[in-house]
A protein has these predicted regions:
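Bacterial N-terminal signal peptides that target proteins for export
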Residues: 2-14
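Structural microenvironment flanking redox-active thiols in thiol-disulfide oxidoreductases
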Residues: 85-127, 140-144
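Thiol-/selenol-based redox modules, centered on thioredoxin-like
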Residues: 156-185
Length: 185
């Protein structure tokens, strides 16, 4: 009799887990959606007024002519953050697949106080064989303005300059493909 009760409890617990797992996944997606909606409002004005630097030290703004001819993916990353570095191979593959349709801005943020700078990042990128375009946020001015707390920090802009998605975690190739499909619509 005790075994029967134990088996019934085990089955009840298993059934509860099976029923709650999809609900938890939905809640996670709902949490992401809510966070993203709040983040979009906060980020948009700060981001479009920011100043960016290319490999040669020339600066530009996101509203510069021609930048919005295609959808844009902006990924903020940092040399001393392993999660940032681990995210870059998936973005390299996405750049290879979508580089003709989507503008990629891979922004390495650094501070000279960190002990690394643009030359360190440039050398590392060359060693890894990355071909996506890299830009720099000197002294983390944009990160501070955006109040970014976790890297990588990724923004997906659609064709009409609309901020469609924001993520603050490393993404798989499949996740990047899905988010890029949204901005290509």
């Amino acid at each position: 009799m005790k075994k029967m009760v134990s088996v019934q409890r085990l089955l009840a617990a298993l059934l509860a887990v099976l029923l709650l797992c999809p609900m938890a996944a939905c809640k996670k997606q709902a949490d992401i959606d809510q966070w993203e909606a709040e983040e979009k409002e906060r980020v948009y004005s700060s981001l479009t007024s920011g100043q960016y630097y290319d490999l040669d030290g020339r600066y530009f703004y996101l509203h510069d002519t021609g930048l919005y001819e295609r959808p844009i993916v902006i990924c903020f990353w940092k040399m001393d953050r392993p999660e940032s570095l681990n995210a870059l191979p998936a973005f390299q593959k996405a750049f290879e697949r979508y580089g003709g349709k989507v503008q990629f801005l891979m922004i390495c943020t650094y501070s000279e106080n960190d002990g690394s700078g643009s030359e360190d990042a440039k050398q590392w990128i060359e060693e890894k064989g990355y071909t996506f375009p890299v830009f720099y946020d000197r002294d983390q001015i944009l990160l501070q303005r955006l109040r970014v707390e976790k890297l990588p920090y990724i923004l997906f802009f659609g064709k009409s300059n609309e901020l469609v998605h924001i993520r603050n975690e490393a993404l798989s190739e499949g996740e990047i493909d899905t988010l890029i499909a949204d901005i290509l619509e």
